[in-house]
Amino acid sequence: MGMPSMPELLIVLAIVVLLFGAKKIPDLAKGMGKGIKDFKKAIKEDDEEEEVKEITKKEEPKVEAAAEEKKSENA
């Protein structure tokens, strides 16, 4: 059971046209495209947020060490 052949794809396309009508199909495709675009954008933003957290975690010990050094110099 591999990929559907051309006649099978045409039958599916005909059923979609009958169900939704020829005028609705571009709107459906546009909506799907927008949904995919928003999904990709959300994933990218999530990845960027994780990178910021990692960088922040790496920098915290340096800041704390510098603060302790300054504190010991003043004492």
UniProtKB/Swiss-Prot annotation:
<feature type="compositionally biased region" description="Basic and acidic residues">
    <location>
        <begin position="53"/>
        <end position="75"/>
    </location>
</feature>
<dbReference type="GO" id="GO:0008320">
    <property type="term" value="F:protein transmembrane transporter activity"/>
</dbReference>
<keyword id="KW-0812">Transmembrane</keyword>
<keyword id="KW-0472">Membrane</keyword>
<protein>
    <recommendedName>
        <fullName>Sec-independent protein translocase protein TatA</fullName>
    </recommendedName>
</protein>
<feature type="region of interest" description="Disordered">
    <location>
        <begin position="47"/>
        <end position="75"/>
    </location>
</feature>
<dbReference type="InterPro" id="IPR003369">
    <property type="entry name" value="TatA/B/E"/>
</dbReference>
<comment type="function">
    <text>Part of the twin-arginine translocation (Tat) system that transports large folded proteins containing a characteristic twin-arginine motif in their signal peptide across membranes. TatA could form the protein-conducting channel of the Tat system.</text>
</comment>
<dbReference type="InterPro" id="IPR006312">
    <property type="entry name" value="TatA/E"/>
</dbReference>
<keyword id="KW-1003">Cell membrane</keyword>
<comment type="similarity">
    <text>Belongs to the TatA/E family.</text>
</comment>
<comment type="subunit">
    <text>The Tat system comprises two distinct complexes: a TatABC complex, containing multiple copies of TatA, TatB and TatC subunits, and a separate TatA complex, containing only TatA subunits. Substrates initially bind to the TatABC complex, which probably triggers association of the separate TatA complex to form the active translocon.</text>
</comment>
<dbReference type="Pfam" id="PF02416">
    <property type="entry name" value="TatA_B_E"/>
</dbReference>
<feature type="transmembrane region" description="Helical">
    <location>
        <begin position="1"/>
        <end position="21"/>
    </location>
</feature>
<keyword id="KW-0997">Cell inner membrane</keyword>
<dbReference type="GO" id="GO:0033281">
    <property type="term" value="C:TAT protein transport complex"/>
</dbReference>
<keyword id="KW-0813">Transport</keyword>
<keyword id="KW-1133">Transmembrane helix</keyword>
<keyword id="KW-0811">Translocation</keyword>
<dbReference type="GO" id="GO:0043953">
    <property type="term" value="P:protein transport by the Tat complex"/>
</dbReference>
<keyword id="KW-0653">Protein transport</keyword>
